[in-house]
Amino acid sequence: MNIHEYQGKEILRGFGVTVPKGIVAFSAEEAKKAAETLLTEQGGGVVVVKAQIHAGGRGKAGGVKLVRSADEAFEVATQMIGTTLVTHQTGPEGKEVRRLLVEEGMNIEKELYLGITLDRATSCNVLMVSTEGGMEIEKVAEETPEKLLKIQIHPTLGLQPNQAREAAFFLGLEGEQFKNAVKFISALYNAYMKADCSLAEINPLVVTKEGRVIALDAKINFDDNALFRHKDYIDLRDTSEEDPLEVEASKSNLNYVRLDGNVGCMVNGAGLAMGTMDMIQLAGGKPANFLDVGGGANPQTVQEGFRIILTDPNVKAILVNIFGGIVRCDRVAGGVIEAAKNIDIHVPVIVRLEGTNADIAQKMLDESGLNLVSAKGLSDAAKKVNEALAAA
């Protein structure tokens, strides 16, 4: 689950991570009052008005502005709220700005990078630091890997003091800045673990001329599987930032991710779903979605899956690929048949069922009288999908 920058900073503050003073605003008037409060507290200077969307690259897209007065904050907020911000992470459709973060200005000396996430290749959390703050870390890793340090964190020992010091040394910090950075890194790791995060990224991490080490920006993602331990975090979810179809699918316990292809996919199991998408691509098609109906698939979830897939106007064919281990193929077949009767399925449907009760399921499909195309094996299914696309 993703959250906004201001929400992430509030959580980090609770774990002792140093973040700027900030006030969230949902209107231009609230932004004006927030700027007035902050400017009074800091005795003038500048404050920053930041658009709050679930995407990076806001600064380059005009979503981060420096202002020197409350009236200027009002003008900037008026321009931002309600507009669509397009960045390299939003896609061409962009995201509508509905809230702002008004934050104290910083006297910046250095911009650095700090992040903690799971390294799936080593099955360990990894601490990453770079002297290239404000840059896309993927770009730094590709073009100047010598400027990025990765430190593997032992799963039972956790982040050790010497590792935090190693990271601070790599960043070229000394004296009070070094001490503050070590404390910051340790506090961020503590927050990452106790909040069950999948990502805690500070970009940029800034060092001020006064020696403060502070999170100028913060991106926090949670492990959805651990949210049952953090009921208060669930309320932070902003569904307006998510794809409406993905939100609708989650209500039926369906794992759905919308893509830009023309072949709808309904599969049980994430691994099989990814393999199915690869086969479609290799056969010449393009998957329109990732949809995992899970091990508890039943006629109702299958029908809901069809309804969600068909909401995408780009879908020209649907592939149902089920391997019946936990889920029984006849239950899935029943859902396919009911969906075909109750929903206007106006595109070809190719069905491949293997495993538990596959013979019964195939008989059900054959006797249904519906125009469903059966496939034997995944390669055959992908081939028939593309034949259907060619004939459309």
UniProtKB/Swiss-Prot annotation:
One of its GO terms (molecular function) is succinate-CoA ligase (GDP-forming) activity. InterPro entries: ATP-grasp, ATP-grasp_succ-CoA_synth-type, ATP_grasp_subdomain_1, Succ-CoA_synthase_bsu_CS, SUCC_ACL_C, Succ_CoA_ligase-like_bsu, Succinyl-CoA_synth-like. Residues 9-248 form the ATP-grasp domain. Keywords: ATP-binding, Ligase, Magnesium, Metal-binding, Nucleotide-binding, Tricarboxylic acid cycle. It catalyses: succinate + ATP + CoA = succinyl-CoA + ADP + phosphate; GTP + succinate + CoA = succinyl-CoA + GDP + phosphate. PANTHER family: SUCCINATE--COA LIGASE [GDP-FORMING] SUBUNIT BETA, MITOCHONDRIAL, SUCCINYL-COA SYNTHETASE BETA CHAIN. Succinyl-CoA synthetase functions in the citric acid cycle (TCA), coupling the hydrolysis of succinyl-CoA to the synthesis of either ATP or GTP and thus represents the only step of substrate-level phosphorylation in the TCA. The beta subunit provides nucleotide specificity of the enzyme and binds the substrate succinate, while the binding sites for coenzyme A and phosphate are found in the alpha subunit. This is Succinate--CoA ligase [ADP-forming] subunit beta. The lineage of its organism: Bacteria, Pseudomonadati, Chlorobiota, Chlorobiia, Chlorobiales.
